[in-house]
Amino acid sequence: MKDYTYSVTEINEYIKDLIEGDPYLTNVSVYGEISGVRPRKGHIFFSLVEENARLECVIFGGDNMGIRLQEGRMALVEGSVSVYIPHGTYRFICSNVRYLDRVGMYQIKFETTLKKLLEEGLLSRPKKTVPRFPRKIGIITSRDSAALQDVIRTARERKAPIEIYVFHTSVQGDSAREELIKALRKANEYDLDLVMIVRGGGSKEDLWVFNEEDVIREILKLRHPVVTGIGHEIDRVIADFVADVSMHTPTGAAEYVIPDASEIHEDLDSFLEKLIASLSNRFDMEERRLETLYFRLRMIGRRKLELNEFKIERVKELAAKLRKKLMDCFEQDQEKLESLGRMLESLNPLRPLERGFVLVKKEGEIVKESSDLKRGDVVSLVFKDGTKKAQVIG
């Protein structure tokens, strides 16, 4: 046979001719569970799935014709296999869809597990409170995932003084269930303020590990509040039901959990304004009250004063107690103010300098990445007690 070099298009066209010319793949019927329905530009894309296989399908113009597919239903689909040359992929072009009188395997598993947890009262347990200002956050996800990067980016943007602990696990595939359980158990050993479980979007099958009963039971054993951010918009996984808070995406979960430093400053400013106004109003009110009381006493004749000397002394005693009470309230408010000041000071970006860290600046701007520097650059090193110049040599 002669050697011949094919282009990618030629190979894909040849495969297309083979498959679309095969009578066993034309005008055939396939049954399976409907999953991952995605209307797009008037067409409907979806998958037919069974336990270990998936067939990508499309109904051209189906969305415009008002066709609405039901996730989890078993269906008999008629059509032909086609090859999409630009991507080198094949899919099933549907001409007709008929529902079968039963639900699919994944839907049965989902409903069975959910019902079992409901009967045990595990879905109605009291939710743990997510702290407003967490300092130590555990993240259960793949260390290489975009979901983890979304959380880290959000933390940087919000300039939050937090520590992040990553517990690596696969989030789909054959090993995901076992790895996820190990990660959950490991996180439970740490002294954390809360745990986030995050991953990007995917099909029902991709997200299935978050419906596994033993994974759900392990989540329920966590001592810490749990926030999920599993990237899906339509269907919820069971992990969302048992979490203390569930968000649609990793970024949404991060924004819910991680406080924004600027918002903290605004809250403190608002609190201080209200505190000062409240104290001022209370002092003014009590001052007017005492002045009125003193004026009334002066209007009483001397004889009346002599007869009511005991009452006057009582009034003085009450006035003294009132002043003491006001001072006690002021001291309590002052303690709150000092506590808020300490919290504000903890957000000071220069505090780490007192622990031996150094702030690097180039042309007055803080250097955040090593890629921002090149050989020969002159930088300023800011220590807690002063600034030194340095030159990058490598």
Curated annotation (Swiss-Prot):
Nuclease keyword on record: yes
Location, primary (coarse class): cytoplasm
Keyword Nuclease applies: yes
Family: Belongs to the XseA family.
Its job: Bidirectionally degrades single-stranded DNA into large acid-insoluble oligonucleotides, which are then degraded further into small acid-soluble oligonucleotides.
Xref: HAMAP family: Exonuc_7_L
Protein name: Exodeoxyribonuclease 7 large subunit
Organism: Thermotoga petrophila (strain ATCC BAA-488 / DSM 13995 / JCM 10881 / RKU-1)
Gene behind the chain: xseA
